[in-house]
Amino acid sequence: MNPAAEFDLIVYGATGYTGRLVAEHLAQRYGVGGEVKWAMAGRSADKLAQVRDEIGAPKDTPLVVADASDPASLRAMVRRAKAVITTVGPYQLYGSDLVAACVEAGTDCLDLSGEPNWMRAMIDQHHAAAQASGARILHSSGFDSIPFEAGVWFCQETAKAQLGGIVPHPA
């Protein structure tokens, strides 16, 4: 985590459907200048301001312009936050540079990816550097992960019922 950051949290992709819902929740729950310092981020300041107004967020809600096709803008954005929630997908097209920027800055990153091959690639590429920088990268923190989580739960319940407990992972 980036302890000297200006914001606790930046919602990247705040003008999209899911990002808008996240920003609306934060606006209702925390307002601006409260216990959680947060900002809305996306490609267009005008669209961010429009969404801010539509969701009823305070006029002084910070807006950060960053573009997935501009790695320098992503690096500048993530340096301002302790954590980034990104709703900008598909992640295999738009998420890799953001993960790299977060790892470099020591900024936590949470995504909604349901793209296992991309997640594996990000882990393989960035795990050691993330450990060194203190960045925590949390993939698949949304609806797309429900089928996987339900599958794991089903396997655990089946193992408990048929084998009397969860089968330990081989070391």
Model-predicted segments: where are they?
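Conserved anion/nucleotide-ligand pocket segment
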Residues: 138-144, 148-171
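Rossmann-fold NAD(P)-binding glycine/threonine-rich loop
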Residues: 113-135
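The conserved SAM/SAH-binding core of class I Rossmann-like methyltransferase domains
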Residues: 12, 41, 87, 112
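Short, conserved SAM-binding/catalytic segment
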Residues: 51-59
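N-terminal Rossmann NAD(P)H-binding glycine-rich loop of SDR-like oxidoreductase domains
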Residues: 7-32
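Conserved Rossmann-fold cofactor-binding substructure of NAD(P)-dependent oxidoreductases
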Residues: 64-94
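ADP-ribose/adenylate-binding Rossmann-like module
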Residues: 90, 99-119
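Conserved glycine-rich Rossmann-like NAD(P)H-binding loop of the short-chain dehydrogenase/reductase
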Residues: 31-47
